[in-house]
């Protein structure tokens, strides 16, 4: 593959086994194995000053992103939701790996000035993210198995052993999470966040992991990073219903929502939750509002490295959700 002297803007669709790449508008997309060796070889063919738009897919995009950044290229990681909305905006119906690679290249070419370049996460971030996701998948599988096998008496002993093994694996993952948090020097931040009523170990880990990933101007930016901000479609006098943007890590959002359910039953948040229910909010809406409040408070504690002081919270109507 000949090396051009002109920098390119490439799109990279990532999957577990391979990467599909659109390296220039007038070329056909091609695939390479998603391995360290193959990625390193391809990056050597790129001209200096080139940029890559890579779709965030679980953790399958990380090897390419890290190697490309280390090699001096500008990397933009695009989440799937944003890419989907861009596809709709240009009325593109086809969706294959090749089409996605071309779409990423086009998106980078047209929108680059408004995009923020990707930088590697701090030490421990990737390990924490992987462990949280693996635990979530394990819990999901265990729950599904318990539901589907609940009435089966014939294989009850076998299922009991399997369920016990899965629970042990879950506990092992949580133990490793604690070790990684300690190795990354995040114990103090974790302790601060866990002081919030309703916030347990796993939710605190997710919030600390999110906070360490970027520099946030304020709590609004942190809430938006978590995908807990509200977006509203509007045209003229018409306005649609507000919906969560759902950017960012879905597992952290799930943990935060679960924390709000737990928190709504505490003395600290009972009045807050009841206030929004009396205003006519549905249960889910009230819990999301509480989840956002928890996220904002966690942000404040981490940013100022302060401990939670319950006496400063007066309850009732929130000044800022």
What are these regions (language model features)?
Residues 2, 76-196, 205:
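Long, charge-rich intrinsically disordered scaffolds of nucleic-acid metabolism proteins
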Residues 2-24, 104, 205-206:
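Gly/Thr-rich phosphate-binding beta-strand-loop-beta motif of the actin/hexokinase/Hsp70
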Residues 25-54:
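Nucleic-acid-processing active sites and adjacent nucleic-acid-binding tracks
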Residues 53-64:
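Acidic, metal-coordinating catalytic cores used for nucleic-acid/nucleotide bond scission
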Residues 90, 116-129, 151, 240-244, ...:
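Short, solvent-exposed helix-loop connector elements
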Residues 201, 206-283, 319-321:
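Phosphate-backbone recognition surface of nucleic-acid-processing proteins
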Residues 267-321:
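Acidic, carboxylate-rich catalytic segments that either coordinate divalent cations
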